[in-house]
Amino acid sequence: MSLKHPTIAVSAPGKVFLAGGYLVLDQEYTAFVFGLNARINIIAGDIHTTAGVQLTEIVVDSPQFLDAQWRYGYHLAGEGGGIKVTQLQVGAQINPNPFVETTLSYALTYIDRVAGHRPSHSLASARLIILADNDYYSHSESDTTRSGRFAKFPVTLSNANKTGLGSSAALVTSLTASLLVHYLPEDLFSIDSDKGKRTLHNLAQAAHCAAQGKVGSGFDVATAVYGSCRYRRFSPATLNKIPEPGVAGFADALVKLVDGESEWDVEVLKDAVTMPKGVVLRMCDVDCGSKTVGMVKKVLAWKSSNPEDSKTLWDELQSRNEQLIATLNAGDVAQLPEKINAVREKIREMGSASDVPIEPESQTELLDALSTVEGVHGGVVPGAGGYDALALLMKDDEETKQRVEVFLEKWAAEKGTKVKLLAVKGEMEGVRSESLDVYAGWV
């Protein structure tokens, strides 16, 4: 009898980087990140075969999109190389999905190593279904077929227009969590325990960085696991020690990294951020996501060539970020506009100094105008900035929401742009188990 759970569901939130963009790249500074109620959901279950038929296959479906099925074979590599995953052809061509494929290799390798000594353990074939809440993607009503939380989109996943809410980190985190919950008994992994969350965090960080091909700051994975938090990044060298999946020693190196508390100098403080009663964090979609990689490189080049000036600016921006969060924590709503504007002032200064449009003029104009709408305390261009979704702090009532929607409709018509208030809201909770009832019609 297998120890695994037959069919389970988990979800992980997206993120909005309210304060600490760019600063998060340096361990001297911290970031303040909020989770969102837009979630990436994964349902994991067995594949049922006829008697005598044995499969070693993982099937991954993303039924909201066209041609979105990936099939993978897997086997145990020699010399401690872990579980090697190979994409199988579906239809006329292979469409790679590096985030899914890498996560499978990492998660299955870890699972096989920690549970492999148990006689009842086996990595049986499984089917995974990915469902993304609608606000992860820009879309017009005419483009989609609505089905509650999960729209059907008439495009392939690669052609979907993301809204910048952190879908890759939420995907890797929820995918990793679903595999751990599905295959491992609760005495080896519990999604609700501190130890379980630490295991999930470390494993998802490793998989996400490998899938990206670089070591990022990790704030998006940390938020997907823990929810809203103050975050100080881990040393990039933490993840330099792992060979590729299938290469000798991969399994041992991965388990040592995931289970070794001393390896991680990351700091995630959940209690350091709160949202006052009656205030909500909302997002505006500006319908043209930024290419943040080039922007980050330019800002870091400026910092490197101007060490003294950049340190002075970053120290002051860190101080202003902390004052904004302290104001939120204290529930001092009247002070929010002043504190938000103080942060924005330094962000524009950094953008000007580095010649990077962190808060472009068009976004400045829109944020300034939105801040005059009754019930809106202010807003920022979150994260790395650019022409992405805006984050607003506003009164949490229907009247304010309607005023903002009317304002944006008028603004879009006058300026000839696409901008709208998303349904998504800030949320404190991170990864969690879900009831299968939520996914009726999709499973």
Swiss-Prot record:
- Induction (free text): Expression is regulated by the Zn(2)-C6 fungal-type transcription factor FgSR which binds directly to the promoter.
The UniProt entry, under PANTHER family, shows:
PHOSPHOMEVALONATE KINASE, PTHR31814
Name of this protein: Phosphomevalonate kinase ERG8
Q: Which family does it belong to?
A: Belongs to the GHMP kinase family. Mevalonate kinase subfamily.
The EC number on file is 2.7.4.2
Q: Which organism is it from?
A: Gibberella zeae (strain ATCC MYA-4620 / CBS 123657 / FGSC 9075 / NRRL 31084 / PH-1) (Wheat head blight fungus)
Q: What does this protein do?
A: Phosphomevalonate kinase; part of the second module of ergosterol biosynthesis pathway that includes the middle steps of the pathway. ERG8 converts 5-phosphomevalonate to 5-diphosphomevalonate. The second module is carried out in the vacuole and involves the formation of farnesyl diphosphate, which is also an important intermediate in the biosynthesis of ubiquinone, dolichol, heme and prenylated proteins. Activity by the mevalonate kinase ERG12 (FG05912) first converts mevalonate into 5-phosphomevalonate.
Gene3D superfamilies the record matches: 3.30.230.10, GHMP kinase, C-terminal domain
